[in-house]
Amino acid sequence: SVLLLQNQEVILLSFKIFRKNCCGLDVHKTWIYACIGITDTNGRTTYKQTRFSSFSKGLKELSTWLAKYQCTEVCMESTGKYWIPVFNVLEKEDVSVILSHPKYTKPQKGNKTDRKDAKWICDLFMCDMVKPSFIPPADIRHLRDLVRYRFKLICMITGEKNRAQNCLTVSNLKLDDVFSDVFGKSSRSITEYILKHPGDLFDVTPFVDRRCKTPIEEIQAAVDGAISPEQAVKLRQCLNHIDELEKHLEEIEQEILRL
């Protein structure tokens, strides 16, 4: 029930209770505020409120506390990533956890506290006024995390390749004009030689794959540049980082295939 003041008259609004025993959680980085609402056969609701640490010990205590009151339905906001450890622990205990976007559980204006927020979430959940967010099964979540990380690695590799290409450009080493892939076998071999022997004149023929369609004369002209010491250091670090990231990418892709 909610009390509203309109034209100096008190109006009582009643909401149907769909869940007789449920819990609302206000999850933060360090603490988790919990409120269980238990409604008896007469429609009277009593609340049990407490606070738990967000450490693993606190999550186990939360699970035990819910079991004590035979509460198997929980609702919490999807705030940042803090909800994920809570969800993982409760999911293993066969607790039905509803995740909701904060805009659907926005608390009332006024004297706002974490305990009141937990009770507000509990009340909304109790009256079935919370729009749940979709949470895929555990195996799909695991796969999704790896796929997202794979995408991040690809973006990082692309960024490093762009920085490496910039080093070649400012050094007037126009490998991108004569090779379709600046980081391919032939181009990479030439780049490695330039880094080991800066300023040396050399014949590119031994480094170029025989299947390369670009004339040797053009490739020879493309490497007629000069790389400064600072650009050489930067290029070396970029290439090393690319190799390291590609190794990580391969490991992640193998794990994705395993799943």
Task: Please annotate each region the language model reported.
Residues 1-259:
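A detector of single, family-specific signature residues
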